[in-house]
Structures are given as structure tokens and as C-alpha cells.
């Protein structure tokens, strides 16, 4: 897999503990390798105002959130498929980590894993089996990356 699978757009001020581009690439590339996917995604780091506007426009929820995943709906190319966009609010991720007494890096990893799984077709809306399936995968990847289970 080449290194041209991730396009990162930074539209916010970066915090001291925002992961490096290499860290984002490592997490996402590892997930793709696990699923034997050769794909591309866009990762956009934004301010609260932008993610709130996107959440309202696309999900009809009038509040900011930590991450939004926008899967791409178009025919797959045999060589490379574009999975979609992840939009993350750095400020919210870092505040959540602090409020939940988690390391900022492990929470970032969890959020990126969660969003990438959404782009791969995993969902957790109103189905306990789907929620459990997604959480098991999140925990598996977090453990692989050296982080603890975020649900305990």
C-alpha cells in the first residue's frame, strides 16, 4: 500500500497533543491492511463551528460533535476506492479525553478508528449486535496500537 491513501486538511488551530500526520497514517493504514482494503480517505480537522454546521446540515443535530463520517457513494474502482471523509473537531476530542480521564492520544486513536469503521460500513444505530460488533473492533485496534479499552 502506498502512502497516498490519506489526504489531511487542517482547518483549525492544532493543540499540543494533536497526533502527528504519521500517527494518523499509521492508524488508518493498519485498519485498511486488516480489512485488505486499498482505499483513500480525507481527514479534515476543524473548529467547533464548522462541525456543528455540518452536523446540523447533514444529520439535523444542532450541536458540535467529535467526529462525522461521510461515506462516499460511488462505484468502486478495481484499483483504488475512495471511502469518504472524516471530519474531526480537535477541541472536542481533547476536551473529551480530559473529562473522561483518558490519554489524549488514545482518545484520538479511538475517534479515528470509530470514524474509519463507519466509512467501512460499520454502524451502531439502534442495534445492540451492531454496537457490540463495532466496539469489539474498536477495542481490538486500540489494543493493537497499545491503548486500553475505552469502555471501562
Curated annotation (Swiss-Prot):
The keyword Transcription does not apply. Its EC number is 3.1.-.-. Zn(2+) binds at residues 114, 118, 124. GO terms for cellular component: cytoplasm. The keyword Mitochondrion does not apply. It is found in: Cytoplasm. InterPro entries: MetalPrtase_cat_dom_sf_prd, YbeY, YbeY_CS. Signal peptide: none annotated. It comes from the Bacteria. It is an enzyme of class 3 (hydrolase). It holds the Pfam family YbeY. Its cofactor is Zn(2+). One of its GO terms (molecular function) is zinc ion binding. Binds 1 zinc ion. One of its GO terms (biological process) is rRNA processing. Its main location: cytoplasm. Single strand-specific metallo-endoribonuclease involved in late-stage 70S ribosome quality control and in maturation of the 3' terminus of the 16S rRNA. Belongs to the endoribonuclease YbeY family. This is Endoribonuclease YbeY.
